Amino acid sequence: MGVGGTADFFYKEAQRLGYVARSAFKLLQIQNQHKIISPGSSVLDLGCAPGGWLQVACQSLGPFSGGGSVLGVDTKKVKVPPLHCDSRVQTISADVTTLPQQRLKALSPKEKGFSVILSDMCPLVSGITTKDAALSFELGMRALDLALGSRIQLEPSDGVGVLKVGGHLVIKLLESEDAK
C-alpha cells in the first residue's frame, strides 16, 4: 500500500469498517467539517470506482426514509458496494469526458439536476507528476463544466449545468511540486 504508516493505517481502517477504499476517509472528513450531503440530497459521484465515495454519500443521506439518491459514473463498470449502500445508489458506465450534460440531467431526480456533485476522477497515472497533475486538472475542469456549464452564468436560473443552485461541488485533484 503506501510507503508511510498513515496510508497503511487508513487502508486497514477502511477494510475494518467495510469501506472498499481508503479514499472514503477523504469524503468523511469533508462531510464531517462541511455537511455537504443532507437527507434528501441528490448526489452525483464522477469517477466513482471503486465505490468508497458512493458508500459515504449514501451513509450521509441518513435513514432510507429520508430519501435522496446517489448516482455514480465511471468508465469502469462499478458494482454498488454491499456495505453502507442501499437501493438509493445506482451506477452507470460512461466516459465523463464525452457525456453530455443533458444526459446527466436526465438521470437526476425529476431531471432537475443534483444538489451535490463529487469528483474523485483520476487519470491513468504515468508516474510523471507534472503530467499527472495536468491531466487531473483537465478532469477537474470537466467536472466544473458539467456542474456549472461551459461558461459562468450571471443568472442562476439559466439552468446551465447539472448542479442545482445553492448546491455543493467537491473536486479532488492530483498535485505535483510544480503545481503547488
Label every model-predicted segment.
Residues 1-42, 58:
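Class I SAM-dependent methyltransferase Rossmann-like catalytic core
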Residues 37, 61-65, 111, 150-157, ...:
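A generic alpha-to-beta junction signature in SAM-dependent methyltransferases
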Residues 41, 65-68, 167:
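Glycine-centered, small-residue-biased loops immediately flanking beta-strands
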Residues 44, 71:
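Conserved beta-strand positions in the Rossmann-like core of class I SAM-dependent methyltransferases
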Residues 47-51, 174:
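Class I SAM-dependent methyltransferase "Motif I" SAM/SAH-binding loop
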Residues 50-65:
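Conserved SAM-binding loop of SAM-dependent methyltransferases across substrates and taxa
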Residues 73-124:
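S-adenosyl-L-methionine
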Residues 129, 133-180:
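Conserved Class I SAM-dependent methyltransferase catalytic core
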